[in-house]
């Protein structure tokens, strides 16, 4: 079943610290020569690069075995692999084939102009859409021929998978304008499936029908790719956000509420991946991070990989959250080649920390957590086997004027890793964390602090429990800022104490700072 990573997928132990190029950034060798070195300089280890069917097969090629690769144009593919190899970058190719953002505008001209051979999907009113019908065998065979040729060429160009480590099949598959295809071929399949009798006739039932149909189509490409050149394969999804109904967003793609239909229809796909642009980053991640479950026979349901996310000043802390909370396979802001230095700075800083943690084999730990805070969602409490950790946004501390002057808070975030009893690493930006025993936490005082970190005014304290504290307390034994070398060894940089720990009350990383802190605790 889907979700069981193939042998090649299981070898993706290094995190994908990625960035996706804008749609037209790899349409010439000159662009490729210019953009890939810039991606390396930003700290990426992987670039997601479109592979354009319309440029690869401008003239329709024969499907005969003898000529199947002779006249495909792989110039851009070859240049991407060559430059990436020189820059020590990995590549994930994005197959812009029959569908890109639902539509079929990356198909070659000969495909677009022959709607008789390659029919379009239709609305219930009979309106043709710029969406090729997934029920047409001609559509499938043309797509399959080109994608198979691409996979064979990649196998010849990069046989050991040193550069190309994964493939995306199509891009944000889904229906728009209509929840399902009503073309004659689609109606025939709909009746043969007895779909209305099984699921009803509303738009949500229509979406399920299309999800299974799209998945079955993709399975043909995935199965062929697996036989030609075995590597991880995934499909990505545009989210169903803002209360939109099927047909108002790219419906029937690999969305969280349709995962079972995609599992059934496309068992050769390794990952279903969310493209996250709207608010609610943590919620979207949770829907796609599906851990081991007994009913899956101990197999991973779906591992989180984010191939597209809005590239912004908050991208870095979001990456740390995804790796810390969900042991993500990778993170990739979209159109990073067009982003401003202000937007890419957080990505570079976060990837520097993540690369160090990877050196120390500290990613994908079972005992790790992710934090992501903003002005409304500003605190999380975790009980780690008797160690109660309260992590907050840095601006919950009163002495930074931006905390109270009406400024919009940038997101703060981090990942916390348990190394052992009373031993943690905190990596991130814009967070503060304290540690208490459960008894201590239950009886902690609630107080309003002034800018000096003490009670704002005398008597401004309320105590939850006035009984005498029983049991032990936790204190900070040491807080060291560290780096992690290429060989995985931890390198001491400086000791945080005094004002930097509020006299032993907490560990913190300021807004705009990017650090790894090694925190040790003790009981007293």
Where are the predicted features?
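The substrate-binding groove and active-site-proximal loops of carbohydrate-active enzymes
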Residues: 16-28, 53-75, 124-145, 153, ...
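C-terminal beta-sandwich/jelly-roll accessory domains of carbohydrate-active enzymes
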Residues: 401-408, 425-524
């Amino acid at each position: 079943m889907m979700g069981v990573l193939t042998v090649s997928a299981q070898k993706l132990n290094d995190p994908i610290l990625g960035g996706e190029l804008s749609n037209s950034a790899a349409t010439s060798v000159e662009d490729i020569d210019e953009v890939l070195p810039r991606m390396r300089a930003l700290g990426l280890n992987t670039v997601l690069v479109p592979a354009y069917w319309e440029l690869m097969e401008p003239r329709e090629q024969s499907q005969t075995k003898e000529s199947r690769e002779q006249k495909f144009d792989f110039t851009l593919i070859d240049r991407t692999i060559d430059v990436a190899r020189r820059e020590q970058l990995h590549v994930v190719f994005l197959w812009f084939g029959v569908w890109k953002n639902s539509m079929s505008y990356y198909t070659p001209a000969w495909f677009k102009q022959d709607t008789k051979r390659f029919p379009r999907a239709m609305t219930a009113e009979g309106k043709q859409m710029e969406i090729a019908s997934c029920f047409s065998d001609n559509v499938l065979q043309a797509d399959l021929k080109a994608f198979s040729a691409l996979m064979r060429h990649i196998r010849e160009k990069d046989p050991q998978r040193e550069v190309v480590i994964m493939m995306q099949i199509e891009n944000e598959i889904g229906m728009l304008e209509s929840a399902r295809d009503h073309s004659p071929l689609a109606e025939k399949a709909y009746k043969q499936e007895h779909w209305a009798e099984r699921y009803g006739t509303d738009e949500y039932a229509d979406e399920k029908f299309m999800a299974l149909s799209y998945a079955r189509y993709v399975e043909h490409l995935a199965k062929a790719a697996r036989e030609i050149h075995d590597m991880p394969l995934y499909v990505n999804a545009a989210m169903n956000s803002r209360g939109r109904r099927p047909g108002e967003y790219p419906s029937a793609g690999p969305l969280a509420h349709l995962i079972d239909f995609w599992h059934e229809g496309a068992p050769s796909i390794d990952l279903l991946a969310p493209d996250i642009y709207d608010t609610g980053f943590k919620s979207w991640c949770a829907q796609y991070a599906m851990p081991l479950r007994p009913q899956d026979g101990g197999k991973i349901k779906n591992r989180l990989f984010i191939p597209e996310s809005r590239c912004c000043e908050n991208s870095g802390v979001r990456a740390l959250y995804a790796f810390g909370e969900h042991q993500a396979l990778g993170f990739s802001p979209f159109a990073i080649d067009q982003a401003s230095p202000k937007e890419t700075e957080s990505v570079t800083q976060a990837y520097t920390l993540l690369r160090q943690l990877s050196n120390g084999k500290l990613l994908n730990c079972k005992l790790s957590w992710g934090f992501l805070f903003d002005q409304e969602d500003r605190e999380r409490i975790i009980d780690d086997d008797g160690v109660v950790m309260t992590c907050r946004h840095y601006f919950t501390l009163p002495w930074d004027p931006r905390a109270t002057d009406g400024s919009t808070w940038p997101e703060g975030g981090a990942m916390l890793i348990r190394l052992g009893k009373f031993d943690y690493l905190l990596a991130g930006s814009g967070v503060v964390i304290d540690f208490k025993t459960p008894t201590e936490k239950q009886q902690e005082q609630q107080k309003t602090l002034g800018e000096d970190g003490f009670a704002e005014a005398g008597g401004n304290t309320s105590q939850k429990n006035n009984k005498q504290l029983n049991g032990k307390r936790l204190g900070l034994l040491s807080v060291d800022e560290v780096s992690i070398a290429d060989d995985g060894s931890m390198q001491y940089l400086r000791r945080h104490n005094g004002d930097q720990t509020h006299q032993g009350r907490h560990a913190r990383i300021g807004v705009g700072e990017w650090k790894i802190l090694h925190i040790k605790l003790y009981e007293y």
